[in-house]
A protein has these predicted regions:
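Short acidic/polar mixed-charge low-complexity motifs
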Residues: 100, 108-110
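Conserved N-terminal/central alpha/beta ligand/cofactor-binding core
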Residues: 1-95, 108, 116, 120-140, ...
Length: 234
């Protein structure tokens, strides 16, 4: 049960999979027959093995991802997965019998009975977006959060906390002079996430790097108090 089937696989924050401390987790999920590694490989547009010059223990596979392709392939995976039914009807309340969960009630008023329930919160459980001075309840940009479930869980002594992720502003490629930027190419021998992936499906795209200067630092320092991280909002 989810808010919208058409937003399954929407990448809430940065369009990348893996990285240092995370890439090996994606491969472990793949080893357990999870789908994220396969979908990441099919939608990857720049594969790099980070820390390649160092020992194997600190290397981290990462791919920059085509967001549209990732969503497309993830939906195809889930909507055709054996013994999995997907419904657009968010859960608004758990149903308990003493201390055991017995089901849930959906936004449309349906009572679904179950002996086991897996809550996949993502960024939606009491989600809150900070943009400068402004705060907006949201699961992700322009999507409503899930409210009420946290309060129920607190009554059963679940510890409820909040995790933070930062999303950099998006830049319009048409406004950038790439000739003045340092090119960072994809690896010639891509390190895939899934053990089943044999070849790359997409044209690889270079990243571009630039650097700050004193003027940029002045702008940051002048406006630092407006950042949610430094104003005390987070």
């Amino acid at each position: 049960f989810t808010h919208k089937i058409e937003t399954i696989g929407e990448m809430s924050c940065n369009p990348a999979i893996g990285g240092l401390g995370k890439g090996h987790l994606v491969r472990e999920i793949d080893a357990l027959d999870g789908v994220i590694g396969d979908v990441a490989d099919k939608s990857g547009i720049q594969f790099r093995l980070l820390n390649r010059s160092r020992g194997p223990a600190v290397r981290g596979p990462r791919t920059q991802t085509d967001r549209s392709l990732y969503k497309k392939y993830m939906q195809e995976k889930l909507l055709n997965y054996c013994n999995l039914s997907v419904f657009s009807d968010p859960v608004i309340k758990f149903v308990f019998d003493k201390k055991s969960v017995k089901g849930f009630i959906t936004h449309s008023g349906k009572l679904i009975k179950t002996s086991k329930l897996i809550l996949t919160t993502g960024t939606f459980l009491n989600g809150l977006i900070h943009v400068g001075d402004n705060q907006t309840p949201a699961g992700r940009y322009n999507e409503k959060p899930t409210t009420g479930l946290s309060e129920q869980l607190k009554k059963f002594n679940f510890k409820i906390g909040r995790l933070k992720t930062g999303t950099p502003p998006r830049l319009d490629a048409r406004t950038i002079n790439f000739e003045n930027l340092e090119e960072q190419c994809a690896d010639d021998d891509p390190y895939f996430f899934s053990f089943l992936t044999k070849e790359n499906l997409n044209k690889q795209v270079s990243c571009r790097m630039t650097y700050t200067n004193d003027e940029v630092h002045k702008i940051i320092s002048k406006n630092l108090k407006r950042s949610a991280m430094y104003s005390g909002s987070i």
